[in-house]
From Swiss-Prot:
Database matches in HAMAP family: RNApol_bact_RpoB
GO molecular function per UniProt: DNA binding; DNA-directed RNA polymerase activity; ribonucleoside binding
Record protein name field: DNA-directed RNA polymerase subunit beta
Lineage: Eukaryota, Viridiplantae, Streptophyta, Embryophyta, Tracheophyta
Record InterPro entries: DNA-dir_RNA_pol_bsu_ext_1_sf (IPR042107), DNA-dir_RNA_pol_su2 (IPR015712), DNA-dir_RNAP_su2_dom (IPR007120), DNA-dir_RNAP_su2_hyb_sf (IPR037033), RNA_pol_bsu_bac (IPR010243), RNA_pol_bsu_CS (IPR007121), RNA_pol_Rpb2_2 (IPR007642), RNA_pol_Rpb2_2_sf (IPR037034)
Organism annotation: Hordeum vulgare
Reactions this protein catalyses: RNA(n) + a ribonucleoside 5'-triphosphate = RNA(n+1) + diphosphate
Keywords: Chloroplast, DNA-directed RNA polymerase, Nucleotidyltransferase, Plastid, Transcription, Transferase
Protein task: DNA-dependent RNA polymerase catalyzes the transcription of DNA into RNA using the four ribonucleoside triphosphates as substrates.
């Protein structure tokens, strides 16, 4: 992307830049803005005034390191100091005081809250302002409405009814005449008529009664309050009534904010100053004028497109943190007012620091932020599955959350791709399921204008003269409301190759339409083929040959790939792998040049400018998704290094490039039905050679508490009644030793909970002691931390966290090595996913003409119907690259150079590989890309030639070890008495309606009876059946109904319907009238 002489130079921006810019704005601007709003707190009775100053605030360096905050479950935060002034009589005191702690963003663009990495994702909302729409009612008459949206999301509507009367609907309850609203806001009838374009329409509808209501502002306010609050009777005008109206209506529905004021001025051609952020009578009258113009055909009949990005704004991390800071300052204000009152009761002399006491008042700030990070929907646990996930998570944009849409109510139109998303929001990358289209990802070149909250995309500016002279081209960033006025060359993304002469006629985009026009008429052009996609979409090679639905699945599944024990970079890639790995910050980059003194698994010592610098490395650290984060040194001792060089590689990176999977030999053919319906057949080589082996770290913790009797729990090795075998790994303190291999059921931490024995359980000696000496005999209950099912592994770390002598938390970290096995999920980069169905011995796998057995067998029927042909190009080119020892980095949409460019590239490389290796089977002209292969079991060739290749296949985090589950007995639901749902609750297997039909179809009455009664909700029968099974007795046949039937009867009774049920005798089929 870089060119000689910096001509038209463009670079991909840092992928985490959006988060950093947002936090930078919060620290530098937002804090000062909120401190400026903090009011002077006055107490006139005692002549005291307290004030905070925005100028010169300071943030101290965090008192703990990031790693310590994670291990000790603390918040990584910085203390905020602000200048304060206290006037007490004639005494003026100035002090710099601490008002609390603010969470600080780390180098990953995340926050550490109570030891957990969390990230705030960007929210996309409807921008404040006014929006017009027209719709037909049931009689076919056009209804015109204008919706005013406030900065807080409150809505008010202006509408013209069938009788051509203008109404304002300020809440769902009531509509109010526009004249009453304008008068209540401070305008009289004369001013209203002077400021509108259609005074005759305004004068046509008020009758004598309405004119009387708007004679004075007070009467208008009373009328407005009565209709707004739905209050009847005779009201009297008062200050408290005005305050309530101000609080409930004007603050919530009329505050437009900076963005809303700009939008309102633009839409209605007003020139109201930007600092006037509230809705004015002039706005309402201009909005009504426009509405009348639409209704009577004198104005522009244009409905606003609510889904256009020019009508949306981004609420970034800066806006959300600023809101919370304002909320915390509001609480601080109330706390200071209470403290002032308390000071005068005690008759002590106040100082600024005593009013903001560190223990009570200043803790408000950090608790406000911790509550926000813990409960706000857009604050999410940072996804650390692999480096790609870490990079992508901060670039998400979501329509969900407070003030936004919900998954259940959002319309199809709001989920759709919009032309204005082009180059700003990726048309591919979104979640599957109920939130499809509501969460998206920013395109790689997009940036957020933090001042106005719009998403901007870069283009090359081309004027007619510059196009002829081929001079330097300037990159311009266009916001969504600006690019409608430009002719944008759409398909002409040849910025990678300046030398190619532009065509005479090019496809272009103008006002959301696609045209074909002369090159001379083009204003701007796109700068890069990847410009329209997110990071996930940009990592898919040959994406142009895939169906968009499969590309969507691929971009989601790459984020679920598990880092493997031995990573390998892809043979066929897109060129974005290096930037993605770099911006994830999982690798260690040299910040200065120097010479390596020594390296080990924990640190690298670097000598630079006469100083010795220690660079710590991450060593087998658990991620939020239980994957293993580990850094390996990649520089030998004594080597001189330069700034920016890679010193150590993180998980899933090789040579500074992203390496999520493995290049394996695949064949597309059916094999004995084992790859039916997306199942995958694999070779045992993938298991024995640790090709798809990954490491996972599980965390188990236990905490000591004080019992209700006041006795403290104790961590100890001395636990009676337990076998020595279960305690074999404990040290003298009762905690498992480092390096121990532990199995299911082993004790990790021994713990005893004291409890007072009941009198009936006393032994004779204990009763004697109690009678003579009055001593209580205490017993202890064993409450140790045991290793649950599926947790076997090696203990790699044990952490003691002791905040006070009685409150001890012990955390045990266990490393598991997981080979690939039947039931694990694997996927390619084209949405081709499958479950391992069988692991074959390598001698039974199909093999090539040179004797190489294939590693995976995919079903060829998975390609034509899904239309993800990119995997065919990738596997064939991968085979050529493997034989030629080459790696390919291919930009998408190469068909813009010539027809069938991808196919020509693949075939030419296969032909080259065939010549180079002297293997004619690599490229056979009769069926290029395919080859005759042999059955490993018989040695006979298969009837048809088979497509073989090297594909990059990922192992996903959906592993069978965490899915497989069985239950004999377990917990039951309280109401229905049926087994609960889910593996985490030790729940049962659901047999739904369709499963019952299937069993009915085979006539298996007894199995059906067991499933629906004994194994489910027949209370008495399920107890007796357990005993009968254990003792080998006949299973009893019970006549009383199951619990779910009783629940149905009760529900019918609640509807006043009595259901009587009887038993039919089996002998003579007579109704037994005795009610069950």
């Amino acid at each position: 992307m870089l060119r000689n002489g910096n001509e038209g130079m463009s670079t991909i921006p840092g992928f985490s830049q959006i988060q950093f810019e947002g936090f930078f704005r919060f620290i530098n601007q937002a804090l000062a803005e909120e401190l400026d709003k903090f009011p002077t707190i006055k107490d006139p009775d005692h002549e005291i005034a307290f004030q905070l100053f925005a100028k010169g605030y300071q943030l101290l360096e965090p008192s703990i390191k990031e790693r310590d905050a994670v291990y000790e479950s603390l918040t990584y935060s910085s203390e905020l100091y602000v200048s304060a002034r206290l006037i007490f009589g004639f005494d003026v005191q100035k002090q710099t005081i601490s008002i609390g702690n603010i969470p600080i963003m780390n180098s990953l663009g995340t926050f550490i809250i109570n030891g957990i990495y969390r990230i705030v994702i960007n929210q996309i909302l409807l921008s404040p302002g006014i929006y017009y729409r027209s719709e037909l009612d049931h009689k076919g008459i056009s209804i015109y409405t204008g919706t005013i949206i406030s900065d807080w999301g409150g809505r008010s509507e202006l509408a013209i009814d069938k009788k051509e009367r203008i109404w304002a609907r300020v809440s769902r309850k009531q509509k109010i005449s526009i004249l009453v609203l304008s008068s209540a806001m401070g305008s009289n009838l004369r001013e209203i008529l002077d400021n509108v374009s259609y005074p005759e329409i305004f004068l046509s509808f008020p009758n004598a009664k309405e004119k009387k209501r708007i004679e004075s502002k007070e009467k208008a306010i009373l009328e407005f309050y009565q209709q707004f609050a739905c209050v009847g009777g005779d009201l009297v005008f008062s200050e408290s009534l005005c305050e309530e109206l101000q609080k409930k209506f004007f603050q919530q529905k009329c505050e437009l904010g900076r963005i809303g004021r700009r939008n309102m001025n633009r839409r209605l051609n007003l020139d109201i100053p930007q600092n006037n952020t509230f809705l004015l009578p002039r706005d309402v009258l201009a909005a009504t004028d426009h509405l009348i113009g639409m209704k009577f055909g004198t104005g522009i009949l244009d409905d606003d497109d609510m889904n256009h990005l020019k009508n949306k704004r981004i609420r970034s991390v800066a806006d959300l943190l600023q809101d919370q800071f304002g909320l915390a300052l509001g609480r601080l204000q109330h706390a200071v007012q209470k403290t002032i009152r308390r000071v005068f009761i005690r008759q002590s002399k106040p100082t600024p620091q005593t009013l903001v006491t560190p223990t009570s008042t200043s803790i408000l700030l950090i608790t406000t932020y911790e509550t926000f990070f813990g409960t706000y929907p857009l604050s999410q646990v940072f996804d650390q599955t692999n480096p790609l996930t870490q990079t992508v998570h901060g670039r998400k944009v979501s329509c969900l959350g407070p003030g936004g849409l919900t998954g259940r109510t959002a319309s199809f139109r709001s989920r759709d791709i919009h032309p204005s998303h082009y180059g700003r929001i990726c048309p591919i990358d979104t979640s599957e399921g109920i939130n499809v289209g509501l969460t998206g990802s920013l395109a790689i070149h997009a940036r957020i204008d933090h001042l106005w909250g719009s998403i901007e995309s870069p283009f090359y500016e081309i004027s007619a003269e510059k196009a002829k002279e081929k001079k330097e081209r300037q990159v311009v960033y266009l916001s969504p409301n600006r690019d409608e006025y430009y002719m944008i060359a759409a398909g002409n993304s040849l910025s990678l190759n300046q030398g190619i002469q532009e065509e005479q006629v090019v496809p272009a985009r103008y006002r959301q339409e696609f045209l074909t026009i002369a090159w001379e008429q083009i204003h701007v052009r796109s700068i890069f083929p990847f410009q329209y996609f997110s990071i996930g979409g940009s990592l898919i090679p040959f994406i142009e040959h895939n169906d968009a639905n499969r590309a969507l699945m691929s971009s989601n599944m790459q984020r679920q790939a598990v880092p493997l024990s031995r990573s390998e970079k892809c043979i066929v890639g897109t060129g974005l792998e290096r930037q993605t790995a770099l911006d994830s910050r999982v690798s260690v980059i040299a910040e200065r040049e120097g010479k390596i003194i020594s390296t080990d698994s924990h640190k690298i010592l670097l000598s630079s400018s006469g100083k010795t610098i220690s660079i710590p490395l991450v060593n087998h650290r658990r991620s939020n998704k239980n994957t293993c984060m580990h850094q390996k040194p990649r520089v030998p001792r004594g080597k001189s290094i330069k700034k920016g060089q890679i010193l150590a590689e993180g998980a899933a990176t090789v040579g500074g490039e992203l390496a999520l999977g493995k290049n394996v030999l695949v064949a597309y053919m059916p094999w004995e039905g084992y790859n039916f319906e997306d199942a995958v057949l694999i070779s045992e080589r993938l298991v024995y050679e640790d090709i798809y082996t990954s490491f996972h770290i599980r965390k188990y913790e236990i905490q000591t508490d004080t019992t209700s009797q006041g006795s403290a729990e104790k961590i100890t090795k001395e636990i009676p009644h337990l076998e020595e075998h279960l305690l074999r790994n404990l040290d003298k303190n009762g905690v498992v030793r480092l390096g121990s291999w532990v199995e299911t059921g082993d004790i990790l931490v021994g713990k005893l909970t004291p409890q007072i024995a009941s009198e009936s359980s006393y032994i004779a000696e204990a009763g004697l002691l109690r009678a003579i000496f009055g001593l209580e005999v205490s017993t202890s209950k064993e409450t140790s931390l045991k290793l649950p099912i599926g947790g076997r592994g090696r203990v790699i770390d044990v952490k003691w966290i002791q905040r006070d002598p009685l409150d001890i938390m012990v955390r045990v970290y266990i490393l598991q090595k997981r080979e690939i096995k039947v039931g694990d999920k694997v996927a390619g980069r084209h949405g081709n996913k499958g479950i391992i169905s069988k692991i074959l011995p390598r001698q039974d796998m199909p093999y090539l003409q040179d004797g190489t057995p294939v590693d995976m067998v995919f079903n060829p029927l998975g390609v034509p119907s899904r239309m993800n042909v990119g995997q065919i190009f990738e596997s064939s080119l991968g085979l050529a690259g493997d034989l030629l020892k080459k790696h390919y980095r291919i930009a998408p949409f190469d068909e813009r150079y010539e027809q069938e460019a991808s196919r020509k590239l693949v075939f030419s490389e296969l032909y080259e590989a065939s010549k180079e290796t002297k293997n004619p089977w690599v490229f056979e002209p009769e069926y290029p890309g395919k080859s005759r292969i042999f059955d490993g079991r018989t040695g006979d060739p298969f009837e048809q030639p088979v497509l073989i290749g090297k594909s990059y296949i990922l192992k996903l985090i959906h592993q069978v070890d965490e899915k497989i589950h069985g239950r004999s007995t377990g917990p039951y639901s309280l109401v229905t008495q049926q087994p609960v749902r889910g593996r985490a609750k030790q729940g049962g297997q659901r047999v739904g309606e369709m499963e019952v039909w299937a069993l009915e179809g085979f006539g298996v009455a007894h199995i059906l009876q067991e499933i629906l009664t004994y194994k489910s909700d027949h209370l008495i029968a399920r107890q007796e059946i357990l005993n009968a099974t254990i003792w080998g007795k006949r299973i009893p046949n019970h006549e009383d109904p199951p619990e779910s039937f009783r629940v149905l009867v009760r529900e019918l009774r609640s509807l006043a319907l009595e259901l009587n049920h009887f038993l039919v005798s089996e002998k003579n089929f007579q109704v037994n009238r005795e009610e069950v």
